[in-house]
Curated annotation (Swiss-Prot):
It comes from Shewanella sp. (strain ANA-3). Its EC number is 3.5.2.7. The lineage of its organism: Bacteria, Pseudomonadati, Pseudomonadota, Gammaproteobacteria, Alteromonadales. Coiled coil: none annotated. Fe(3+) binds at H73, H75, H243, D318. This is Imidazolonepropionase.
């Protein structure tokens, strides 16, 4: 056989639902890679003969290989920080109170408007490096800290540039409807007009976004405004998704389902009608335990209902300066289990197969199957559950991206 590399002495959590074992596991396995894709995968005892003198062989020392992790919800291109708001919250101020007083998203907007692309790129690269060290091979990056055409485009350009200069694949999302900027404080409909008539066409003209998102909440945009933005995005051929049901239940999830959204994110206040709608539309539920933890929320997402209706559950970092300044997917695995009572297998699926579904890329990544992209990680662990069980010592030993060893 002519392959580019072979991995042996490994166990593989394929996350392939067609394999009945937990995690889609194959123990005592081997993987062969050719032209950036998985060419062979199965028990080591069934590995076809190959020329060991000409093909690189990597030995996993009994560790576990998983698909490369996918962080399907981040805001990692931003300037400044909001440590002062952290102190205010510890003194009793709520996220909504801070936002209504002009803090929150708007304070980061001001910092991003002042920053140039070089500064934003450098900050973003540091954060992307941190995720990559934990086995992340694909990440979604949202805009939303510009709230004017120039700065929204600037953030999206930086996100695209990060993807061009880093081994991690970057999917970009235009989130101009993240908050109402000060200049439109009493005219949110006018700002929605600006998004639809000026911002979105400019984003499309430069091919800067793979999807469009809206923060559908009582401190941001109502259902009618959300539908206007997402309908315009769909008409332009872009995927749609939304932040919804984080602070209240406005019916955003049912709207998302009706529009065929890829995902609804946060969903702490999601009810059974919303869960049923997501199930019927195939929309993913993105759980963001970092924000739940950092904001000290008490209303948990309806995990049992999501299980009952078979809605794909995704885990993501929501890395951002205000509500989840936590740049770690491994910590999300632990939080998903300890805070939301996911099983370790559900948590890992939420950062692999289901995360790929939320980004519309499940045909190429998210599970380890012959023909899919060779994106995988080797972990120094005895069982996949260890990834969620323990935090603090990074067990990621090797990362293969598009068939190339990028971290060792």
């Amino acid at each position: 056989m002519s392959w580019d590399q072979v991995w042996i002495d490994v166990n593989v959590a394929t996350m392939d639902p067609s394999i009945s074992a937990p995690y889609g596991a194959i123990t005592n396995a081997a993987i062969a890679v050719k032209d950036g894709k998985i060419a062979w995968l199965g028990p080591r005892s069934e590995l076809p003969a190959f020329d060991v003198l000409s093909i690189p062989v990597y030995r996993g020392k009994g560790g576990w290989i998983t698909p490369g992790l996918i962080d399907a919800h981040t805001h990692l291109v931003f300037a400044g920080n909001r440590a002062n708001e952290f102190e205010l919250r510890l003194k009793g101020a709520t996220y909504e109170e801070i936002a209504r007083a002009g803090g929150g998203i708007i304070s980061t907007v001001n910092a991003c408007r002042e920053a140039d692309e070089a500064e934003l790129f450098d900050l973003g690269r540091q954060r992307l490096n941190a995720l990559a060290k934990e086995g992340v091979t694909t990440v979604e990056i949202k805009s939303g800290y510009g709230l004017d055409t120039e700065t929204e485009l600037k953030i999206l350009r930086v996100a695209r540039e990060l993807g061009q200069h880093h081994h991690v694949d970057v999917k970009t999302t235009f989130l101009g409807a993240h908050a109402v900027p000060p200049e439109f404080k009493d005219n949110s409909d006018g700002y929605v007009d600006l998004i639809i008539n000026k911002m979105l066409p400019a984003v499309i003209a430069e091919n800067l976004a793979d999807a469009v998102d809206v923060f559908c909440e009582n401190i941001a945009f109502n259902l009618e405004q959300t539908e206007r933005v997402l309908s315009a995005a769909k008409a332009a051929g872009l995927q749609v998704k939304l932040h919804a049901e984080q602070l209240s239940n406005m019916g955003g999830s049912e709207l998302a389902a009706r529009l065929g959204a890829k995902s609804v994110d946060h969903i702490e206040y999601l009810d059974e009608a919303g869960v049923k709608a997501l199930s019927e539309s195939g929309t993913c539920a993105v759980l963001l335990p970092g924000a739940f933890y950092f904001l000290r929320e008490t209303q948990k997402p309806p995990i049992d209902l999501l299980r009952q209706y078979g809605v794909p559950m995704v885990l993501a970092s929501d890395f951002n300066p205000g509500s989840s300044p936590i740049c770690s997917t491994l910590l999300m695995l632990n939080m998903g289990c300890t805070l939301f009572r996911l099983t370790p297998e559900e948590a890992l699926a939420g950062l692999t197969l289901n995360a790929a579904k939320a980004l519309g890329i499940e045909e190429s990544v998210g599970s380890l199957v012959v023909g899919k992209q060779a994106d995988f990680c080797l972990w120094d662990i005895a069982t996949p559950a260890q990834l969620a069980y323990s935090y603090g010592v990074n067990p990621c030993k090797d990362v293969v991206k598009n068939g190339k060893l990028v971290h060792q």
